[in-house]
Amino acid sequence: YVAFRAFREDPQANPLKTPSGKIEIYSERLAKIADTWELKKDEIIHPLPAYTPGFDGWDDPLRKTYPLQLTGFHYKARTHSSYGNIDVLQQACPQEVWINPIDAQARGIRHGDTVRVFNNNGEMLIAAKVTPRILPGVTAIGQGAWLKADMFGDRVDHGGSINILTSHRPSPL
């Protein structure tokens, strides 16, 4: 397989679906969007490939308050949230927060402990999976678990739904 084979063999006869018909490093379309869209102060759309700090990301000022970064992954026991209610799958593949042994030791967490995972968006109680298979400073929770929280009470999730911890804020694009 060769990506863009026809374009590579004859770019004149097989233009790409860009304004110039070519691979664009500078995007006229993104430049126009950046000039015409109403963006929040911390939202950036750049016509050139450029690093832009993400919100809720590694360099967010809230990191001083919440030092561990949380990431989600597709879990082997579910397809998104489908099959999240199947008992045998829940037993075979329990919902856990992955944490590096260095971070776990600093917090007095042992494998299997129920831990409180929280940030400014929400909180959950979930079992800890202490493993060197995740980097120090990073935690991970499989996505797709069903929410089990009293949303009219304490709002603490007991099902391991990563969505309780996200801002639900879309990126500018």
Regions found by a protein language model. Give the residues of each.
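Long, low-complexity segments enriched in small/aliphatic residues
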Residues: 1-87
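Long, contiguous, secondary-structure-rich segments that constitute the structural scaffold
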Residues: 81-83, 87-98, 102-173
